C-alpha cells in the first residue's frame, strides 16, 4: 500500500514537472500544435485543456462537455488512454485505466445510488474478475462478462448469508450452496435466482 502511494505521489510530481516545462501552443492552426499546452473550445460548448502532440490531445488533459460530463487524465492520439477519471452529470464516476477511448483494465465504477463495481473492464464493460457492492452492502464476486456475473461466483449479505455456486446474468442459476447466519446450509439447484430443487 505504501509503495503504491509513493508511486502515485512520484507520478503526480513527475507529470507536474513535465507539464510545467511545456510551452503554450501558439500556432493558429491546431493541427500544428505539438509538444505544447493549449485550450480548445468548440461551438457546442465542449472544452479541452491540456497537452498536445501533432495536432491531437496527447499526455495529460481535461475534457468538459456541455452536459456536465468530464474526463481528467491521460491521452494518446486524441483518445482517453492511460489512467483517468470520468464523471457523469448524475453523479456516476469511473476511475481507472483506459485504452483507445474505452474503459479497459483495472478500474472502479461508482453508481449514483452508492453501489460500486471494483475490478476489470473491457471496452467500457465490466469484464473479468470483479466485485459488485450494492448500496446496502451485498456483494457479488466472480467473473464478469458484458456487465453481468456469469459462471462460478460468490454472493454475500451483511446479515451473514452466503451463496457459493453458479450464476447467470448476475442471478443464482445452476448448482450452489447457501449458508445462513444460524449455521444452516442448503445445497441445491437455482434457476433465475430462485431455488429449483434440492441436491
Language model features with spans:
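Sec-dependent signal peptide recognition
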Residues: 2-11
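Glycine/tyrosine- and acidic-biased, solvent-exposed loop/turn segments at the edges of beta-strands
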Residues: 5, 15-199
Amino acid at each position: 500500500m505504501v509503495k503504491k502511494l509513493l508511486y502515485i505521489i512520484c507520478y503526480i510530481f513527475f507529470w507536474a514537472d513535465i507539464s510545467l516545462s511545456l510551452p503554450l501552443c501558439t500556432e493558429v492552426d491546431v493541427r500544428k500544435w505539438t509538444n505544447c499546452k493549449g485550450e480548445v473550445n468548440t461551438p457546442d460548448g465542449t472544452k479541452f485543456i491540456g497537452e498536445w502532440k501533432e495536432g491531437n490531445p496527447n499526455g495529460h488533459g481535461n475534457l468538459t462537455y456541455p452536459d456536465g460530463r468530464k474526463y481528467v487524465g491521460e491521452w494518446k492520439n486524441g483518445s482517453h488512454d492511460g489512467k483517468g477519471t470520468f464523471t457523469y452529470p448524475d453523479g456516476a464516476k469511473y476511475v481507472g485505466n483506459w485504452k483507445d477511448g474505452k474503459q479497459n483494465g483495472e478500474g472502479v465504477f461508482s453508481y449514483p445510488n452508492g453501489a460500486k463495481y471494483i475490478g476489470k473492464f473491457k471496452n467500457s464493460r465490466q469484464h473479468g474478475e470483479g466485485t459488485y457492492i450494492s448500496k446496502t452492502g451485498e456483494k457479488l464476486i466472480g467473473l464478469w462478462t458484458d456487465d453481468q456475473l456469469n459462471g462460478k461466483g460468490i454472493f454475500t449479505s451483511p446479515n451473514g448469508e452466503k451463496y457459493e455456486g453458479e450464476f447467470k446474468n448476475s442471478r443464482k442459476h445452476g448448482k450452489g450452496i447457501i449458508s445462513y447466519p444460524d449455521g444452516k446450509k442448503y445445497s441445491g439447484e437455482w434457476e433465475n435466482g430462485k431455488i429449483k430443487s434440492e441436491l
